[in-house]
UniProtKB/Swiss-Prot annotation:
Membrane-crossing residue ranges in chain numbering: 5-25, 28-48, 59-79, 84-104
Keyword vocabulary terms for this entry: Cell inner membrane, Cell membrane, Membrane, Transmembrane, Transmembrane helix
Protein name: UPF0060 membrane protein PSPPH_1503
UniProt-listed PANTHER family: UPF0060 MEMBRANE PROTEIN YNFA
NCBIfam families referenced in this protein's UniProt entry, alphabetically: PRK02237.1
Superkingdom of the organism of origin: Bacteria
């Protein structure tokens, strides 16, 4: 159950870290945004290692669905952009795929 917490926190730190670079490089904000970006992306990587999974690739694949959910939420809540129907449809497919991976029997080393 803690896996979901680690995934959620990792997603927040990854999105914020990437968004900080976006602000600097795409919106002309101060280069000082690199500092919180690097801290946030480091925390993202550390948190993702807390997931109880035998293989990194499987953990990252399952995390991808949660990241996409968090990204669409970020789009609406932080950037104040209403997600399109295609955003919701793509999100649904990704969540289904991530759920299949999460519920699979091979989360521990065989």
């Amino acid at each position: 159950m803690l896996n979901y917490l680690w995934f959620f926190l990792a997603a927040l730190f990854e999105i914020f870290g990437c968004y900080a670079f976006w602000l600097w490089l795409r919106q002309g904000k101060s280069a000082l945004w690199v500092i919180p970006a690097l801290i946030s992306l480091t925390l993202f990587a550390l948190l993702l290692t807390r997931v109880e999974a035998a293989y990194a690739g499987r953990a990252y694949a399952a995390y991808g669905g949660i990241y996409i959910v968090a990204s669409i939420a970020w789009l609406g809540l932080v950037e104040r952009v209403r997600p399109l129907g295609t955003d919701w449809l793509g999100l649904a497919f990704c969540v289904i795929g991530a759920t299949i991976i999460l519920l699979g029997p091979r989360w521990s080393a065989a």
